Amino acid sequence: LEIGANSGMDTKVLMQLARNAHVHCFECDPRAIARWRTIVKSSRTTLYEVALSDKTGEAEFHPSGGNPGGRWENYGQWDMSGSLLPFDRHKDNAPWMKYLDPIKVQTTTLDEWAAKTLPDNYVCPLIWIDVQGAEAIVFRSGVETLKHVHYVFAECDPRPNYKGQATRDELAESLPEFELVRAYPGYNLLFKNTDLVAPSKH
């Protein structure tokens, strides 16, 4: 599962790493959805134009804009920092960023989606998630689904970019069956499900 698929660049990487897997992708920003559908052309992926949240229905999504320049000069409006959470002090880290007006998006929960979509006794090797501070919200509404997941790779930026964003401890608390395996550059954390994955050998 790729939650927060954005333009599909990481989708293609996941497809290369797991050549026999089907990648289920979630994205709610219309600009990113358009990019994804241009970049990703494969029957091994499915894109769901919805935001995973703690309820099913409709919610405000806070899009990002602006242009960072440099290697992103030709990208256009920056759509990689939008969130269900309101912006806080993101401009402290990215002064060029613009906070765009909120838009309405459709939402569902991880558990509701899985119950409708995945077969019984499924196994999910990996959840890759980057939803700009709202990761714990997704996990708290996916308790049953997480029982079938081996690993979670999640972003957890400690900088106050969004109001109500999860801290590292709060993210860990939302994954009670998981333990932290490794922290990677870019504020990325890898967790493993200790009920499904054997302990590492030392």
Regions found by a protein language model. Give the residues of each.
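Phosphate/nucleotide-binding beta-alpha loop and adjacent structural elements of enzyme active sites
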Residues: 1-202
